[in-house]
Curated annotation (Swiss-Prot):
Underlying gene: cobD
Highest classification ranks of the organism: Bacteria, Pseudomonadati, Thermodesulfobacteriota, Desulfuromonadia, Geobacterales
A UniProt-annotated Pfam family: CobD_Cbib
InterPro entries: Cobalamin_biosynth_CobD/CbiB
Example of a GO biological process term: cobalamin biosynthetic process
Any GO MF annotation of the entry: threonine-phosphate decarboxylase activity
Alphabetically ordered keywords of this record: Cell membrane, Cobalamin biosynthesis, Membrane, Transmembrane, Transmembrane helix
Organism superkingdom: Bacteria
GO cellular component: plasma membrane
Signal peptide: none
Transmembrane domains' residue ranges: 51-71, 77-97, 153-173, 206-226, 296-316
Protein name per Swiss-Prot or TrEMBL: Cobalamin biosynthesis protein CobD
Length: 318
């Protein structure tokens, strides 16, 4: 196994074993604080909001990637093994499979024991929609949609960028992702200032989202689900979403599970009608949630396996 392969595998295993320990300082928290400071500074310095937003994007991503590179490089100068360890640790912080499983499991466990109010409360921690009035199937839908969508931007995308460019590129992606979640809104405050961040997030997830859909399709039969259904619904309904990317993994999951996602959600008290994704062949329940979690882990394992095979082939032919 190559050094890069060992670093990637270590990061994945650390995430699968430990998730995001609350005691461990998380780079995304630091990135969020950096964005807040930069936004305040740039709003005072630059009058053109689009220019300010572009500068915010460049500075936040550049500082984040530079800090990651400096940390790995500095550790390597102390000892080569230290650089490997730091790189693996930084890569670990970019992955969210275990935490995504755990957070959605709290919702599922509450529903299984019949505590709908508690399930709604837990769901509110991981979705942007209003959850207070959701029915049980709607809560299950929220849990399934969250796992499916975040399989792309919480697992496959950061892992892909980590494989390509190590910790600096993976953390640069997390910076773009964090920028979008903080300033990528189409409201009066961020319509122009957050434009560059929102578009960059769409661009950064363009390939990973489609790769996630493909990996889910391949993982579906291994998870006891329908690969043919995943492929069919992904092609048919992958664009039934306001995001150019989020609909792809959601459609693949819906097709694999035989459930229907999407539809009307309530945001800040206002119903927002969205297109449906998939066909309601089966109910949204604990079985559907467990199937989505299996798809997430299956897609991640397939990406690691694919990378290992490609690396082996390149090593042999070199």
């Amino acid at each position: 196994m190559t050094e890069a392969g060992a670093v990637v595998l270590t990061a994945v295993l650390l995430d699968l074993l430990f998730g995001d320990p609350r005691w461990l300082p998380h780079p995304v928290v630091a990135i969020g604080k950096l964005i807040t400071v930069l936004e305040k500074f740039l709003r005072r310095l630059v009058t053109n909001e689009r220019v300010g937003g572009v500068l915010l994007l460049l500075l936040a991503v550049g500082i984040t990637a530079g800090a990651a590179w400096g940390a790995v490089r500095g550790a390597s100068l102390v000892h080569p093994l230290a650089g490997v360890v730091v790189s693996a640790l930084l890569g670990w912080t970019c992955l969210a499979a275990r935490s995504l499983h755990g957070e959605s499991k709290r919702v599922a466990d509450a529903l299984v024991r019949g505590d709908l109010p508690e399930a709604r409360r837990y769901l509110s921690f991981i979705v942007g929609r209003d959850t207070a009035g959701l029915s049980e199937p709607e809560v299950w839908r929220g849990a399934v949609e969250t796992v499916a969508e975040n399989t792309s931007d919480g697992v496959i995308a950061p892992l892909l960028f980590f494989m390509i460019g190590g910790a600096p590129l993976a953390l640069a992606y997390k910076a773009v992702n964090t920028l979008d979640s903080m300033v990528g809104y189409k409201n009066e405050r961020y319509l122009h200032f957050g434009w560059a961040s929102a578009r960059s997030d769409d661009l950064a997830n363009l390939i990973p989202a489609r790769l996630t859909g493909l990996l889910m399709t391949l993982a579906a039969p291994l998870a006891g689900l329908s690969g043919r259904g995943a492929w069919r619904i992904m092609l048919r309904d992958g664009r039934n979403h306001s995001s150019p990317n989020s609909g792809i993994p959601e459609a693949a999951a819906a097709g694999a599970l035989g459930v229907q996602l999407g539809g009307t959600n309530v945001y800040f008290g206002k119903p927002v009608a969205k297109p449906t994704i998939g066909d309601p062949l089966k109910p949204l329940d604990a079985t559907a949630w467990r199937g989505t979690v299996r798809l997430m882990y299956g897609a991640e394992c397939l990406l690691v396996l694919l990378a290992a095979v490609m690396t082996t082939i390149l090593t042999i032919t070199d």
